[in-house]
Amino acid sequence: MILTKLKDFVGISEHDEYEEDYDEEMEFPQSVASQPPAEEVAPPPRISREPLSLNNETSIGTGVRNNVIGMPGINNSVAEVVVVEPHSFDEMPQVIQTLRERKSVVLNLNVMDPEEAQRAVDFVAGGTFAMDGHQERIGESIFLFTPNCVKVSSLAGRSQESNETSSSVSSDNFPTWGYETSRLAQ
C-alpha cells in the first residue's frame, strides 16, 4: 500500500495509458496527407575528372593549392659555412641567429680577450646544444658549430655525433678553449 502511494506520488504507476499510444496510428494534417508522393529524384550524373597534375607553373589564383609549406631558413641550395671573427661578446647573438638559419659557423676567437672568448664559446655552445647541433674544436681558439642537419666527420672517418662530447684536458696554465689535443694535430 505504501509502495503504491509512493509510485503514484513519484509518477510511476502501472497504468496502460502508455501502451495505448503505440497502437494508434499517427495522424497528419490534411495539407501533408493530401499531397501526392514526391517523385524519386535521380542523383546528378557523375562527371569524370582528369587526374590532377601539379607543376611549377601552378599558381594560387587558378584554384589549385599546394599544401606543402617550406621550413624557414632551409633552402635547397648548397650548404653555407660562415666564418666569424668577433671582436666582442656582443656579436654572439648574431652567431646563434646564423645557426638558427641552418648555416654552419667557424668561430675564430684569436682576436678576443681570453676571458671574453671563453664566455663567447660557452654562449654559442649552449645555443648549439639547445638546437641539437654539433660543436668541434678545429684549432687553437677556432671552433666549428653546426646545426643538427650537418654531420661532422674527421679525416680518419670517425663521425662526431651530437650526443658525444669532445674530450678535453683541463690544465691550470691553459684555458679550456685554447688547449689543443693531440688528435687534432694529425
From Swiss-Prot:
Main location: cytoplasm
Protein keywords: Cell cycle, Cell division, Cytoplasm, Septation
Record GO cellular component, one term: cytoplasm
Spans annotated as Disordered: 14-59, 157-186
Gene3D superfamilies hit by this protein: SepF-like protein
GO aspect biological process, one term: FtsZ-dependent cytokinesis
Subcellular localization: Cytoplasm
Ribonucleoprotein listed as a keyword: no
Sequence ranges of Acidic residues compositional bias: 16-27
Pfam families named in the record: SepF
The keyword Cell cycle is annotated on this UniProt entry: yes
Compositional bias segments (type: Low complexity): 159-171
Oligomeric form and interacting partners: Homodimer. Interacts with FtsZ.
PANTHER family assigned to the protein according to its UniProt record, in alphabetical order: CELL DIVISION PROTEIN SEPF
Function: Cell division protein that is part of the divisome complex and is recruited early to the Z-ring. Probably stimulates Z-ring formation, perhaps through the cross-linking of FtsZ protofilaments. Its function overlaps with FtsA.
Family per record: Belongs to the SepF family.
Protein name (Swiss-Prot/TrEMBL): Cell division protein SepF
Organism, scientific name: Synechocystis sp. (strain ATCC 27184 / PCC 6803 / Kazusa)
Taxonomic path: Bacteria, Bacillati, Cyanobacteriota, Cyanophyceae, Synechococcales
